[in-house]
Amino acid sequence: MEDCLHTSSENLSKLVSWAHSHGTICSLIPNLKHLLSEGSHGNLTAMWGCSAGHAYHWPLTATCRAGSQERVCFQDNRSFNSDSPSIIGVPSETQTSPVERYPGRPVKAKLDCNRTRDSCDFSYCSEPSELDETVEEYEDENTLFDMVCESSVTDEDSDFEPQTQRPQSIARKRPGVVPSSLHSSSQTQMVDECSNDVIIKKIKQEIPEDYYIVANAELTGGVDGPALSLTQMAKPKPQTHAGPSCVGSAKLIPHVTSAISTELDPHGMSASPSVISRPIVQKTARVSLASPNRGPPGTHGTNQQVAMQMPVSTSHPNKQISIPLSALQLPGQDEQVASEEFLSHLPSQVSSCEVALSPSVNTEPEVSSSQQQPPVAPAITTEATAQCIPAYSTKLNKFPVFNINDDLNDLCTSAVSPNTTKATRYALNVWRYWCMTNGLKDHTDITKIPAVKLNELLENFYVTVKKSDGSDFLATSLHAIRRGLDRILKNAGVGFSITSSTFSSSTKKLKEKLWVLSKAGMSGARSRNIVYFSLSDEEEMWQAGCLGDDSPITLLSTVVKYNSQYLNMRTLQEHADLMYGDIELLKDPQNQPYFARTDSVKRESRSGSTRVCHGKIYHEHSRGHKQCPYCLLYKYMYIHRPPTQMEAKSPFYLTARKEATDMGSVWYEEQRMGLRSLRGIVPNLAKKVKLENCENFTFVSFTQVSRRLGSHSCCQ
């Protein structure tokens, strides 16, 4: 054998690298075992190994070839527990052919077999599942050799050679092994129907083709840097079939398959019935190989590894197989630091997204084909990211924002206030998220739902809608969402409003939910130490021009003040729900006009209810007509208001126009005033007169005036 050991310095360097790598995982000294021919290429491969089962196929030069030869290998029933220079071959029950020798070679006690093993430059190494266990614990000693992984010492410039393997071994012993096709390579596999063997032809690496996938990809960290951990579940025992069957076709996660898959021949893999029906005793293999670039522990960047966790047996579910990252590295990937960082972060995202959405995960890797595929990092970017990341983004417990450009987003845009636009889009996102999580994707466009159907959906929506973290909305937030949806319908011109009597049943559900939230302390009202305005404070507001009818803002602030004082409106919700028809201009028995809050719009759904006054506003000219509550309210309701907003069901508080010139008599937009702006009116008044703790001033902070008629008195 020594006469044939002619090799190049490069291959010798690779052997030394493997020996160093082997020394990091095993204390036994490897020695030369036997020689294998390389098929059509004719190059020899010397196999080095130790008694623990670690093996390395060392390529030799063409000078060792002594004529045409056929590949000869040992039987699968072999043992690595001997330190002898050769491997003991044990004939199997299925082989009766005598021992054949290499033509023109000395006999080395090699046995022919009907199944050959690949000895390409990707060196296969194998070891027992546990070093403290004997190999005899396996039912078949060939199961020990079936547990193989791809070494890294000859990965970078290797040529692939034909190999013959049992499909049962592939599916049973290597369900999750990621092949060297992750190196920017392409692999084609062919099926040889003769003797039910599968011949796998590996071609020189060019571009990344297809990749095996494994379930539950997640990111782990180790001593050598970040590592990609790919977890594969145990494969169930194959069933006996009467004819050739396809092994390893169970479907796995679809999203990751598109980015990481391996291509099989269309004919599939066939196996003999006798091979499939043979009893199987599965063990968990644990093999660790070091990278050829491995240096001292302090070196960083060359020691990144990919750990593949493949529980093959239920008895040892925690055993792992580790594969160095260099075995999965693209040519020239050392310069692509950004791509490596991306790959180190993406798998955990793919895993968390896919596992959470998949009710069950099969245990066989999905094998699919893709003829043209970009490099690995772009493939994962365009495939896994696009399919796994949902169409909306989230920040902690913030509600999702859908990244959809459509007409509904345009309907949310407000030319009056950016806060209104933000609140309307928020309401739209809440509705879309609720539809998607409740199997109602066809109803995400609220403008295309008929009124009757929308009323039914809203009945369920008000009761079941939650935040993205599963908690309930505050009562004020639920009100704002309802107003936002109604604003979208109005801008779309659908011809109905969700606050109308057509939606009475859904409105009833909303009130019930608001009552529950209020009882649970989730009304949304701020807990404040209420501070009251003094008479001098109010006088200062008049003198500073904060109150009056000089501008849209001052007139609106004055109306809010008088409604709070005279019409008994003390909460933000009462002001927000106020409609134009809820305040009526009436006359008393003395024929004196006055404004009264009758809530006539709210009473439409109440049959037989009598008119009740919650307060009255009369003419009061003791301090001049510029401070008369009746005159100022009249101006707001009948002079400076848009004519289209003088209907009974129009919102009472409108957004003030910002243009100081060319406003004419109309000072307000045809749009409801936002909650935030309405809530800030009173604190802003306190701020303008330089009072402390401005946020503690509310609608009840105004001085309560005496009324000619008590509250809740009947109107004539």
From Swiss-Prot:
Keyword annotations: Isopeptide bond, Phosphoprotein, Ubl conjugation
Coiled-coil segments: none
InterPro entries: DUF3504, KIAA1958
Region (Disordered): 84-103, 153-189
Cross-link Glycyl lysine isopeptide (Lys-Gly) (interchain with G-Cter in SUMO2) residue location(s): K201, K204, K237, K283, K626
Residues bearing the modification Phosphoserine: S97
Name under which the protein is recorded: Uncharacterized protein KIAA1958
Organism: Homo sapiens (Human)
Gene: KIAA1958
